[in-house]
Amino acid sequence: RLGPLWSLPSDAGSKTGLSDQLRLGHVSESALDDTIAMRVRFEGAAPRPNQLYFRGPVLTWFDGQTWSVRAVPFRQQAEADGGPVVQAQGRAVSYQVTLEPTRLQSLPLLDGTLAASPTPPQTEPEMRRWGLDWQTRRPVGERIQVSGQAWLGARDTTLERFGRQTPYLQLPAGVNPRT
């Protein structure tokens, strides 16, 4: 038997947490969600609590109404094409994260992760790094495991290289930069 055509799946609404966009006037539609998003296991000593920042989707594109994740062709190589350059600094930390499905291409990995791969190797998802942000070719629709290595003092030098011309600061024509 089929359900009504006008019903939505129970998980169709947005939730607090990861999203690939934020639209003006739609923030109140989010609902609190206390489900587990990920589990992390460190090899050796875990970083201090103030170093446990997991970088998820970075909303770098603004069209005047909606902030969203900047679309970068998956095949593009960051440094070869003038993209972000990251300097590995600080203590290296190896870890494994089990991520629940997000339906997003962004992977919330420990900030400063410069090396990551699915566990076991040769399995989905295909992953790539753009600066300090990690993405998959397709949205993550099932639980995945990723092994990563992060440098706790890694720096993205994009702003130093491009100054105010960085895409993170671009606004559409006609938008007042003070609003």
Region annotations inferred by a language model:
Residues R1-T179:
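Helix-boundary/low-complexity linker signature
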